[in-house]
């Protein structure tokens, strides 16, 4: 299977560097232990990439120091050699050598053709299944024995498990004596079902499908049944097979597979990655690429593609080494699992109130993307698997599958790991948690998210409704008075007076604050919607670009990309979310909430840019042309605010200062850089002022800045 010991490994060309004999000996021991665990249980202290780097390092050291090769080096062993049984194989069950790229594959084919002295005219291309290699013996068409690979010369008898192996019939279609070789694995569906059955019986879930297949195959006297699946990849005669033995020896590999399928044994023929016969290296590579593209959508795991010389004569001429045949190779695909560190656990609340844990990981590259988070099922699962902060964990990801933690690598624990703390109250709203089931739930259910969204909308940087904290929002939700924050604008005095601790004064004050919120500028109303990826600053930019909510809602992704800071992906996401928010926006309009941005002029309609006349607006007033911004005092400027404001700016929050900057045509920023045009520095300005001085950035005190943007201050105070 792999270059060393047949280990399933990732596509990589790097190797561990072993400086001396001691490092080599340690590497051999580590690789041997990892391979033993891998084939015995489906788990290992090394991920695929780490094992492969170690394996290549061992092979490189042995090539340079052949006199120092250790007897237990995995370079001379068949994969799975740790699980030795007492049933001899009639013909050794060998491993496969690996290639990791098109270039390496071409080199391998050239080597094979040199060895046999002629071109290979037929290739068999089939999926490399991520399971356990076994040999199934049939005598006179009846199942007799199931044997694991073991050390390649003898394996373990696991016949007791055959009854739960799909695709391995009790009786063949013909009364022949034959040995069928293949892989036993768990399909994705079997893995899910197996874990459900195990947890129902008080067991821990399998770490991964390979681990599940290994454990299931060796388990005896279970109180429950877990299914696996067999895929045949070859067949050979037994000593008393008679004429069949001679026939099998002459058949091309592709015809052997067809014969096995005709006997009623399961092969990959009925799958999207069915074995294919190719005549050129180019055809083989095309099939390799095709299988790789299908990998994520397959209902079972593969970790590569097996390529074999199809003709029996080519196989016989090429022969086999002590560990692998010379006429076949495994073309490995990128690893879909890696070991990394569990840094933290976040607790998130879904729309229905389900509290779900999410793992924060030390970023690691898996299957072509960087993974920093992984799903964790529920608190009970964390407890069962004894996950701890600081653990080295095996993380799985393939294609579009959400990354998940398979298991902690217990052997790598240092003693510094700490237990994961579970929340005592809802992390979203602070209410009690219903922990009676495996999936914990906020007792407020769907209302939990409602409390958070209404509280956010009423916050200081959004609608700024004074007196409407989360406690009051909980009251309103519990009383059934609000289903979204638009309902705040239809609250009646008598409804509020009926609530606990709501007297006449507090009621009138709240209603007055809500009435004021009705006049907030579009930027704040849009921010209150909570559109993902658009915070306060982005909301201001969107509002000033489009000027009205109607134009924002009507904008397509291309139009949104004209807003500074919005790319293609974010634009599409905003458009999609605005469609979902349309009913809420409609309620806000009906309630008389402001849907315009003071001082902003909408962009010209497509195709009318040249006809647009900038001078049509009063460029010297706050209502001037924001589309061009040419007459605004901060047009084209990037402004940073630091320190305590004074004078006319004293009562403005930092968010209000940023709004003021953007109303006056500028762009607000939180950090000083070479792009900064102006720093507004109040008392205790600190390091930002020092950096601005070093960079030669213009610095203004609050009073100077207030004079510069004086015409826009009134609009800011009203907001």
Curated annotation (Swiss-Prot):
It comes from Streptomyces griseus subsp. griseus (strain JCM 4626 / CBS 651.72 / NBRC 13350 / KCC S-0626 / ISP 5235). Pfam families: BRCT (PF00533), DNA_ligase_aden (PF01653), DNA_ligase_OB (PF03120), HHH_2 (PF12826). InterPro entries: BRCT_dom, BRCT_dom_sf, DisA/LigA_HHH, DNA_ligase, DNA_ligase_AS, DNAligase_adenylation, DNAligase_N, Hlx-hairpin-Hlx_DNA-bd_motif. This is DNA ligase 1. GO terms for molecular function: DNA binding; DNA ligase (NAD+) activity; metal ion binding. Belongs to the NAD-dependent DNA ligase family. LigA subfamily. Residues 629-719 form the BRCT domain. It comes from the Bacteria. GO terms for biological process: DNA repair; DNA replication. It catalyses: NAD(+) + (deoxyribonucleotide)n-3'-hydroxyl + 5'-phospho-(deoxyribonucleotide)m = (deoxyribonucleotide)n+m + AMP + beta-nicotinamide D-nucleotide. Its cofactor is Mg(2+); Mn(2+). Zn(2+) binds at residues 426, 429, 442, 448. Residues 596-626 are annotated as: Disordered. PROSITE patterns: BRCT (PS50172), DNA_LIGASE_N1 (PS01055). Its EC number is 6.5.1.2. NAD(+) binds at residues 48-52, 95-96, 126, 149, 183, 308, 332. Gene3D superfamilies: 5' to 3' exonuclease, C-terminal subdomain, 6.20.10.30, BRCT domain, DNA ligase/mRNA capping enzyme, Helix hairpin bin, Nucleic acid-binding proteins. DNA ligase that catalyzes the formation of phosphodiester linkages between 5'-phosphoryl and 3'-hydroxyl groups in double-stranded DNA using NAD as a coenzyme and as the energy source for the reaction. It is essential for DNA replication and repair of damaged DNA. Keywords: DNA damage, DNA repair, DNA replication, Ligase, Magnesium, Manganese, Metal-binding, NAD, Zinc. Residues 609-626 have a biased composition (Low complexity). The active site is at 128 (n6-amp-lysine intermediate).
């Amino acid at each position: 299977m792999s270059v060393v010991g047949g280990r399933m490994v990732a596509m990589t060309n790097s190797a561990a560097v072993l400086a001396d004999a001691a490092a080599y000996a340690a590497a051999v021991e580590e690789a041997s232990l990892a391979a033993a665990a891998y084939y015995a249980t489906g788990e290992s202290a090394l991920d695929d990439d780490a094992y492969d780097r170690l394996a290549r390092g061992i092979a490189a050291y042995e090539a340079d120091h052949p006199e120092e090769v250790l007897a237990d080096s995995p370079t001379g062993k068949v994969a799975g050699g740790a699980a030795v049984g007492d049933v001899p194989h009639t013909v050794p069950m060998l491993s496969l050598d690996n290639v990791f790229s098109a270039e390496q594959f071409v080199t391998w084919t050239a080597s094979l053709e040199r060895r046999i002295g002629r071109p290979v005219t037929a290739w068999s291309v089939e999926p490399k299944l991520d399971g356990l290699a076994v040999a199934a013996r049939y005598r006179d068409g009846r199942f007799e024995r199931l044997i694991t690979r073991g050390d390649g010369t003898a394996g373990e008898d696991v016949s007791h498990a055959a009854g739960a192996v799909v695709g391995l019939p009790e009786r063949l279609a013909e009364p022949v004596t034959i040995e069928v070789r293949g892989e036993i694995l768990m399909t994705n569906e079997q893995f899910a079902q197996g874990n459900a059955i195990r947890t129902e019986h008080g067991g821990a879930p399998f770490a991964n499908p390979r681990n599940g297949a290994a454990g299931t195959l060796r388990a005896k006297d279970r109180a429950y049944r877990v299914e696996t699946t067999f895929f045949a990849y070859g067949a050979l005669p037994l000593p008393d097979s008679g004429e069949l033995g001679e026939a099998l020896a002459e058949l091309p590999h592709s015809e052997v597979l067809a014969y096995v399928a005709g006997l009623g044994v399961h092969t990959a023929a009925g799958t999207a990655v069915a074995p294919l016969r190719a005549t050129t290296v180019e055809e083989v590579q095309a099939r390799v690429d095709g299988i790789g593209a299908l990998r994520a959508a397959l209902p079972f795991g593969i970790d590569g593609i097996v390529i074999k010389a199809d003709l029996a004569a080519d196989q016989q001429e090429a022969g086999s080494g002590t560990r692998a045949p010379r006429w076949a190779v495994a073309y490995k695909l990128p690893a879909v699992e890696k070991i990394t560190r569990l840094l933290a656990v976040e607790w998130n609340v879904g729309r229905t109130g389900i509290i779900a844990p999410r793992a924060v990981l030390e970023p690691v590259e898996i299957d072509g993307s960087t993974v920093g988070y992984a799903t964790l099922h529920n608190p009970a699962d964390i407890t069962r698997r004894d996950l701890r902060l600081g653990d080295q964990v095996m993380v799985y990801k393939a294609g579009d599958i959400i990354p998940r933690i398979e298991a902690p690598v217990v052997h790598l624990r240092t003693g510094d790991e700490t237990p994961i703390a579970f929340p005592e109250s809802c992390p979203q709203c602070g209410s009690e948690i219903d922990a009676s089931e495996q999936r914990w739930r906020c007792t407020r259910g769907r209302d939990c998210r409602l409390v958070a969204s209404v509280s956010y909308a009423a916050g200081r940087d959004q609608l700024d409704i004074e007196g409407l904290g989360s406690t009051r929002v909980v009251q309103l939700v519990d009383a059934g008075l609000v289903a979204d924050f638009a309902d705040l604008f239809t609250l009646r005095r008598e409804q509020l007076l009926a609530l606990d601790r709501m007297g006449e004064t507090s009621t009138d004050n709240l209603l007055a604050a809500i009435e004021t919120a009705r006049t907030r500028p579009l930027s704040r109303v849009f921010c209150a919607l909570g559109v993902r990826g658009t915070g306060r600053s982005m909301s201001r930019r969107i509002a000033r670009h489009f000027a009205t909510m109607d134009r924002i809602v009507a904008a397509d992704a291309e139009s949104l990309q004209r807003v500074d800071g919005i790319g293609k992906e974010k634009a599409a996401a905003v458009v999609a979310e605005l469609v979902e928010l349309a009913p809420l926006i409609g309620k806000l309009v009906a309630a008389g909430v402001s849907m315009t941005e003071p001082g902003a002029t909408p962009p010209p309609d497509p195709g009318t840019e040249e006809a647009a006349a900038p001078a049509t607006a009063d460029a010297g007033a706050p209502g001037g042309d924001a589309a061009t911004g040419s007459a605004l005092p901060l047009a084209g400027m990037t402004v940073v605010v630091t320190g305590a404001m004074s004078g006319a700016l004293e009562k403005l929050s930092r968010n209000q200062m940023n709004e003021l900057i953007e109303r006056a045509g500028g762009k607000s920023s939180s950090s000083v850089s070479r792009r900064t045009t102006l720093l507004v520095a109040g008392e205790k300005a600190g390091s930002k002022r020092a950096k601005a001085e070093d960079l030669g950035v213009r610095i203004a005190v609050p009073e100077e800045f207030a004079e510069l943007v004086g015409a826009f201050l009134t609009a800011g105070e009203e907001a």
